[in-house]
A protein has these predicted regions:
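Conserved active-site "lid/cap" helical segment
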Residues: 1-89, 100, 173, 177-191, ...
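Condensing-enzyme catalytic core mediating Claisen C-C bond formation in acyl metabolism
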Residues: 1-23, 148-164, 194, 225-292, ...
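Conserved catalytic cysteine-centered active-site region
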Residues: 2-5, 52-116, 120-126, 132-161, ...
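Catalytic-loop motifs flanking and including active-site residues across diverse enzymes
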Residues: 26, 64, 93-97, 170, ...
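Beta-strand segments within the central parallel beta-sheet cores of soluble alpha/beta enzyme folds
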Residues: 42-52, 82-87, 113-117, 190-198, ...
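Short glycine/threonine-rich loop-to-helix capping motif typified by GTGT followed
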Residues: 55-64, 278-283, 311-334, 361-363, ...
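Active-site-proximal alpha-helical scaffold in enzymes
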Residues: 87-119, 171-205, 245-251, 361-381
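ATPase catalytic-site recognition across NTP-hydrolyzing enzymes
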Residues: 199-200, 204-212, 224
Length: 416
């Protein structure tokens, strides 16, 4: 079977960049990923996958990748006539792009495919566009369906569904799930805050993170309430950024210099699942995605050295640690409280700072997770390095279908 490798990865810094365009960010990560792969040019690239969610709010509803890459083509930096496939899947967008590049290589379509994710969610001149971007992640054709669904679920969670101004529907749905988890399993606000504080502490060592200051659990709990039990520090911020990865075949890699081959990381598995309107006591779609990924890679959860997961809120990290098999159902809070998910623990999670602290430019997030894991597996993560890391997992979800994400990706990387 053909093997696929990530030969280069790169992420921009995440933050609020009112003076930078989508084209600016695309240029940075494209040139950055070439440099990381040790390539003088992109002439071998045979396919491109471009992920973005929000350019439609600026009027760019289609051909987004072509628009952002054309200046590079004109300058001779990006090869001509390369197919550019535009993808969107909410917060899972960049993971979908990587999945496409991976399939390109496995199918023999090309020996080198690029995945790029770019997003700008900070729009001080028209903040309503940011809310429109997020609203697009939930069914806009049948609002009554999910309004009644959440109203009924809120009763079961002990937290009435009462969306309010100044926040997205996502925060309310995560808060309801957290409230139900607390009522059912005894999870505490402090356990959620411990996971959050861990990530803020980690991001202080990540030069590309949006927030680079440590917080204690007490700081997190004292922050402004968003939707109980969530405080502002527990919720991913608004911001901009981009990330990219180059996926190659084993045959192409074998032709590269030894220094390039030495830094390549194999994609052991890449799985996707779609969400549904589930009950609160049903497992989420990431559990199935993880089970499929472990089977494809011939691994179990015990083989994972570290993970990056989609913590749009800090409760999500506790929940995903359960769905991914790092602990039993209902035990995510206790796992975080034990220190197991911190640097030096048995299963470090979100050492990049996670979405809540590294940042969450929607269409770039999945590839930024991959960039963090590449740094870790190459031994290049500095103060947040996991000693001896060989196998890593990225879980990313996007959009909402009830209490499921609409799309979920689980990717396993291995250093051979």
């Amino acid at each position: 079977m053909t093997e696929a490798y990530i030969v280069g990865s790169y992420s921009s810094s995440f933050g609020k960049f009112a003076d930078r365009t989508h084209k600016d960010l695309t240029r940075e990560v494209y040139l950055g990923v070439l440099a990381d792969a040790g390539l003088a040019n992109g002439n071998d690239i045979g396919m491109a996958w471009f992920g973005n969610c929000g350019m439609w709010t600026d009027g760019q509803g289609s051909i987004r990748g072509q628009v952002c890459l054309t200046p590079l083509v004109r300058e001779g930096l990006f090869p001509e006539r390369v197919p550019v496939i535009n993808v969107e899947g909410g917060c899972a967008t960049a993971s979908i792009a990587l999945h496409g590049a991976w399939k390109d290589v496995l199918s023999g379509q090309t020996d080198l495919s690029i995945a790029i994710g770019v997003e700008k969610t900070f729009n001080p001149a028209a903040p309503e566009r940011t809310m429109e971007l997020f609203d697009g992640g939930i069914d806009q054709y049948d609002r009554d369906e999910w309004l009644s669904y959440y109203a009924e679920a809120g009763e079961a969670a002990g937290k009435p569904f009462a969306p309010g101004p100044g926040r997205t529907i996502f925060m309310d749905t995560y808060a309801m799930q957290a409230a139900w988890h607390m009522r059912t399993y005894g999870t505490t606000e402090r356990q959620i805050a411990i996971a959050c504080a861990k990530n803020h502490t980690a991001s202080a060592h990540n030069p590309k993170a949006q927030y680079r200051f440590p917080l204690s659990a007490e700081d997190v709990l004292a922050d402004r309430p968003v939707s109980w039990p969530l405080t502002r520090a527990m919720c991913a911020p608004i911001g901009d950024g981009a990330a990219a990865a180059l996926v190659c075949s084993g045959a192409w890699l074998a032709r590269q210099p030894a220094a390039v081959r030495a830094r390549a990381v194999r994609i052991a598995a890449s799985t996707m699942t779609a969400g549904k309107y589930r009950r609160l006591d049903e497992p989420g779609l990431s559990k199935l995605a993880a089970e499929r990924a472990y089977k494809a890679a011939g691994l179990t959860a015990r083989d994972i050295d570290l993970a990056e997961v989609h913590d749009a809120t800090s409760f999500c990290e506790l929940y995903q640690s359960e769905m991914l098999g790092f602990c039993g159902i209902g035990e995510g809070g206790r796992l975080a409280e034990s220190g197991a998910t911190a640097l030096g623990g048995s299963i470090p999670i979100n050492l990049s700072g996670g979405l809540v602290s590294k940042g969450h430019p929607v269409g770039a997030t999945g590839l930024s997770m991959i960039d963090e894991l590449m740094l870790q597996l190459r031994g290049e993560a500095g103060a947040r390095q996991v000693s001896g890391a060989r196998t890593a997992l990225a879980e990313n979800g996007g959009g909402v279908m009830g209490f499921d994400e609409a799309a979920c990706s689980v990717i396993i990387l291995q250093r051979d």
